[in-house]
Amino acid sequence: MTILKTTILFVLAAVAEIGGAWLIWQAVREGKAWWWAGLGVVALGIYGFFAAFQPDAHFGRVLAAYGGVFIAGSLGWGMLMDGFRPDRWDVIGAAICIVGVGVIMFAPRPGG
């Protein structure tokens, strides 16, 4: 259950953070209406709550692991929303990051 909960929270965090940043990018760089940026700010605020719901008690561990999810998620978002096509090095780098997420979050620890 912990792995499932952690995974769901990381995915929700990625959608909120990457989506929020993308909305702001659209307003500032792509000429969309400024209310897109406002929605982006709201999404980024929502993102901030997801880490607090992670089962692990250590902020540094959760945010460090989430960084790997953010990297892979950003590439995926770019593919879905902007037509970005990652090269093999992007994919290899993202895969390494996801392995790192697993090590950080789920490695056996003393007393755990």
UniProtKB/Swiss-Prot annotation:
Record-annotated membrane-spanning stretches: 8-28, 33-53, 62-82, 91-111
Keyword terms, alphabetized: Cell membrane, Membrane, Transmembrane, Transmembrane helix
Organism of derivation: Paenarthrobacter aurescens (strain TC1)
Pfam family, one: UPF0060
Subcellular location(s) of the protein: Cell membrane
Record-linked HAMAP family: UPF0060
Name of the protein this chain belongs to: UPF0060 membrane protein AAur_4166
The keyword Membrane is assigned to this record: yes
Family statement: Belongs to the UPF0060 family.
Principal cellular location given in the protein's record: membrane
Keyword Oxidoreductase included in the entry's annotation: no
Entry GO terms, CC: plasma membrane
Membrane topology summary: Multi-pass membrane protein
